[in-house]
Amino acid sequence: AAGRVLMTVEAEAEIDFNSETVVTTENIYTLDMLGVENAYEKLREEKKSDDIKFYCVGYSVKHYYQNGYVITNLEGHKCNKISCELIATFLPDEVVDGLYAAVERAGLYVANLTLEPIAAINVAIPERFRLLNIALVDVGAGTSDISITKDGSIVAYGMIPSAGDEITECLAKHYLTDFNEADALKCKSTEMDEVEFSDIMGLPYKVSSEEIAEVVKDTVYSITKSVADKIIELNGGKSVSAVFVVGGGGKIKGFVESLAEFLELPKERVALRGSEVMGNITFMQDDIKVDSLLVTPVGICLNFYEQRNNFIFVNINDERIKLYD
């Protein structure tokens, strides 16, 4: 649900020093926060309201500048001025409150808040690949999240409200099953040649994965067409050089091939990413299957150690106040 109301804003920020100064980590963090603040003000201007209540749930720096020249890492360099260009993403206050409330009702607490495309791209597309014009598509249940890299940085985020649940609904209607049975059917079809199930009348069926792929073909075409159109829009009106697909929805047969067709790319330039990008991740369970389903969860875990995008709660006069950390 969060992705459907996500707002993305590009902004700039700069810091002028009184004299030549060695840039510290604190200077860089201050610069980033100035950029986020400028993005927030820009969002308020676009919404034409001073009462806007949006929270920044993540940001990515596109470029840092030292005295006006692009630089990868500012820390330790001497200069008179530092600046940055970044992309900040915001969610409405009520959406963030809803996410926290749902977690708290389960008896848990939120340790970190991030966006799925930010988490996934940090695993699936390492910085050494970001000079290339690549798209990452995280095909989840309700949304397909998209991010674009070019010239060494992440240059755009986007989403479409179409993903794996539409495929599940298609199967449920065709085979007359409930949603959970259809979802299990969808998942099994990506790993087995034949799948057994029962419809709501109790009648047993055994169907091939090829038949299932044929049933959902039109739905897959519709989703991949929307994804391709969004990628082209985010990339300035042209296709990218390659696409990495993660998430469960992208595992359905025909998905990556259809996406390649709509983007006019060779089939080998659109591929699922799984174990190939998690070679340096050690899992405690020996029998865990390392595939595209794990890319985003692993990215979320890594983000917890690397970022500070979360909220803290304090009680003042018996009233709980939420603060952005």
Which role fits each region the language model picked out?
Residues A1-A2, E127-A156, L171:
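Gly/Thr-rich phosphate-binding beta-strand-loop-beta motif of the actin/hexokinase/Hsp70
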Residues A1-R4, A242-G250, R273-S275:
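Glycine-rich beta-strand-to-loop/alpha-helix junction loops that act as flexible
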Residues A2-I134, E191-S198, K206-A213, L234, ...:
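Nucleotide/phosphate-binding catalytic cleft detector across ATP-hydrolyzing
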Residues V57, A88, D93-D97, A101, ...:
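Phosphate-binding glycine-rich/basic clefts of nucleotide- and phosphate-handling proteins
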Residues F129, S258-L265:
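Short, solvent-exposed amphipathic alpha-helical segments in soluble enzyme
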Residues G140-G142, F262-N280:
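Acidic-glycine-rich active-site phosphate/pyrophosphate-binding loop
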Residues A271-Y324:
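Glycine-rich phosphate-binding/hydrolytic loop that grips phosphoryl groups
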